[in-house]
Curated annotation (Swiss-Prot):
Binding sites annotated in the UniProt record for ATP: 278, 351, 358, 377, 402-405, 412-414, 430, 475, 487-489
Organism (species): Saccharomyces cerevisiae (strain ATCC 204508 / S288c) (Baker's yeast)
One CC-aspect GO term: cytoplasm
Enzyme Commission number(s) of this protein: 2.7.4.24
Keywords associated with the record: ATP-binding, Cytoplasm, Cytoskeleton, Kinase, Nucleotide-binding, Phosphoprotein, Transferase
Domain of life: Eukaryota
Keyword set includes Chaperone: no
Protein name: Inositol hexakisphosphate and diphosphoinositol-pentakisphosphate kinase
Amino acid sequence: MSGIKKEPIESDEVPQQETKNNLPSAPSEMSPLFLNKNTQKAMQSIAPILEGFSPKTSASENMSLKLPPPGIQDDHSEENLTVHDTLQRTISTALGNGNNTNTVTTSGLKKADSESKSEADPEGLSNSNIVNDADNINSISKTGSPHLPQGTMDAEQTNMGTNSVPTSSASSRKSSTSHPKPRLPKVGKIGVCAMDAKVLSKPMRHILNRLIEHGEFETVIFGDKVILDERIENWPTCDFLISFFSSGFPLDKAIKYVKLRKPFIINDLIMQKILWDRRLCLQVLEAYNVPTPPRLEISRDGGPRANEELRAKLREHGVEVKPVEEPEWKMVDDDTLEVDGKTMTKPFVEKPVDGEDHNIYIYYHSKNGGGGRRLFRKVGNKSSEFDPTLVHPRTEGSYIYEQFMDTDNFEDVKAYTIGENFCHAETRKSPVVDGIVRRNTHGKEVRYITELSDEEKTIAGKVSKAFSQMICGFDLLRVSGKSYVIDVNGFSFVKDNKAYYDSCANILRSTFIEAKKKMDMEKKNLPIIREEKEQKWVFKGLAIIIRHADRTPKQKFKHSFTSPIFISLLKGHKEEVVIRNVNDLKIVLQALRIALDEKAGNPAKIKVLANALEKKLNFPGTKIQLKPVLNKENEVEKVQFILKWGGEPTHSAKYQATELGEQMRQDFDLLNKSILQNIKIFSSSERRVLHTAQYWTRALFGADELGSDEISIRKDLLDDSNAAKDLMDKVKKKLKPLLREGKEAPPQFAWPSKMPEPYLVIKRVVELMNYHKKIMDNNFAKKDVNSMQTRWCTSEDPSLFKERWDKLFKEFNNAEKVDPSKISELYDTMKYDALHNRQFLENIFDPGLPNEAIADELGSHSLVDRYPINVLAKNNFKIIDSHSMNNSGKNSSNSVGSLGWVLESGKTSTARNPKSSSQFDEPRFMQLRELYKLAKVLFDFICPKEYGISDAEKLDIGLLTSLPLAKQILNDIGDMKNRETPACVAYFTKESHIYTLLNIIYESGIPMRIARNALPELDYLSQITFELYESTDASGQKSHSIRLKMSPGCHTQDPLDVQLDDRHYISCIPKISLTKHLDMDYVQQKLRNKFTRVIMPPKFTPVNITSPNLSFQKRKTRRKSVSVEKLKRPASSGSSSSTSVNKTLD
């Protein structure tokens, strides 16, 4: 463009600050674009505004947020501290020679006023107190900092646009011993031989950590790699062994190990085989005079099977295993079963003899309506469903038939022994009531502690003794003052009960100490030469990528303009810019008002933006993104103006992140405690991500171990990337037609086969949205909405609730015009309100009784009565495949969950059951529940496709978005491999990097245990982990393996049903293995083979400006300076050395 007065800026110099003198003083300096009268008038109106600010680029690049040193706070102020209160901020610029860093530090530490907490923000975590984005940091002093060890970086980084950025390295935390726990004389070593998923479960972690905290015991976790791949001669030796069967566990192998090493065992491994056959369990219980319900048996398999070893054990307990012939049986009538002359009348319970088969049927008497109920492993919030066609017993397989008993209070009792003299018991709602599972915030079934009667305590002791299981769970029924055992579950712990954890640890401690005394006496009397074996595979390192915790719904308005007024806001940049500072947002608001006055664009669009920006101006996290569109001459022809707000961390985020940090600390204490000495933490610059990283870090190290560690900002790795924008836009254009009438989804779209086509689902959602809009408007007009909910999260109120929903109602008022990108906003909002505004949700969408006429247009039936549910969610995020981990020959096509999704019943009863778990089970909320279900379906099958529909698109978008992060992770793992001590690197980021990184992994060709279309929703705090293990052979040669895991995060299938407390948070689902243990070089090569598929653009993150320049002055030399990788510091800085900075200048 000609005719522009240029201000010369040296191409090798970064301006530290632009002043008012840099700004145009009159419209005569502007581009010919501005020569028409309206434009001149508009720019003359803007000119006075420009006198009040100094445009400059942000100085923040990569930076570190430091946790405070110990002792700056007392315990009583803990709850009042926010991220801002507990972080020191440093901005680091690595000099070009790489020998030192300059660190700019601001203390910014202050004690929060506890009296300032509002009723709406009981945790003192209002968003106004949370640390601002990394861009809004002012520095006041400089301090020296020793150079940090540089991670292994390869030549590939020259393609990723980050070779001038500091590598993933940060100072390591050194644990403090300001409050050391008392140390006691060492007793011995506890070996834990069980599948990792069980060993690292919450109860096991708590109990083992209690055992080792005073130094009496050390633990050795055998681990899946050793258990499955190593010979028992190479398994580590121990004094005491905790071992038990679960899916995939090689029980016979563990039995051979016990015979070889003879450790003290708390649960007899051979006797655990009894639990596989319900017939044997019942025979053992009878031998010990434990009451059980009356029963009949139909064995079509020849009876229970047992090897000689197990037969010998059973004989010791008075049970003889004999072959059994198939009995004569018949149904005398529809209600009476006869087996070998003995009869049983309905209702009765039909149980498979296989102890691992939970498909249990209950048959009801015809006089009570007939039919039956199918019980199954808990799926989401269901554990059973009624089937009116269930009349005749199954004729294939072997079954036990027990007389059905009406239990007291419709409850079952779950009992947990720790030896013969201790038993903890809890009640739960029986699954036969309505099949609805009540869950707490940890995702566990709601239970209540109950006191056992003397008779029940005696029963518990007999169960523990009969099965030779010190730790053993079993189920009781209480019927008219008597108790009956109906199932024995074997090794199991109580969940989420600290008193139980304490009791269990104390009893185990005493047991182990007594056992060690006997073992030592035996050694004295009969010296035994024991071979000592250390752990074969040692946990060496961890790279973990974590999505941020719970947030408010993200909202935005997006419009495009060609007016020079909007183009001038770019400050001459030709890439995306971001504006966050409140003063700068005020200037943009003034520009919008001027543009409205001068009709510089569609008035309706401008008015929407101006009104929204005025309301949200002071909201934390409000920002404007300006995305230029260039013509063939590389000049800006229009600007996409995007106003965003929301997406702020909620009060729940603190609890979620803290809990995850505590869990990881417990894992490290068990796997390799020395890893805590070398942990590096990185975060994107967004507030919700920083907030998560900070609370996770504090919990990981403990309040008494805060040191000088840093949370380092890595925008280049973890912030939004524009590199895949064009490709993602193309994919989004493909998604729109799929939602239109008559369009069938392509095969790779993976739409559930038995669901109506996407258009019909969208159409129904639009109908439901229109219906609920009328209800909400009616209730706002006729009811006192301010009294519906007394406490609000994140400073909301009824008007803001209505504003959010009104925006969604406009987006979903026409099935032909629904934008696929709005589906995530709908699902986001619905999930948020189900957790944080449930009381208001219930009241504002209450259609009233009797139902009003507006309900007639919907009809009385749902679109479908069976909804797709993720296979992993169906199995409670457990991989139910006993062979998958033993059969290395299986490829990914046979991996668990290859079908991905199955249909589950979504029917609800027509009348609310008094024992029902949720107010939303009432018929008047049938449409609201349907809306939630259908929004979930659309979210699951539409939103992940924004990152690619075809495999090629998924890989390309994945690489363009997360290639720098993927490369850095491999560099980190290589660095860990070469270290003598273990290490951990944690990356905190947002959803897009989680999905795209997973797509890279899946497209790399690494054999996976979970098919990609079986991956569940990746919710808040979802994680991807790379675990590194090391083995050293006799010659000193080292081998390394990698195992990939993932967690779906803080997820619930049914947010309307989960029972909440005031914290409104859902716990994190434990990690599940994506792969077996694989050779490290193999994994790295598989991933690197895909890296060369794309070439990263020289710049792929948005410019962040602190003050928009409304003059639209073209500055070619400035753009030139932005594009270079090495920029010299001005001479005034006192250094002539070049500075290596991030290519992205803010």
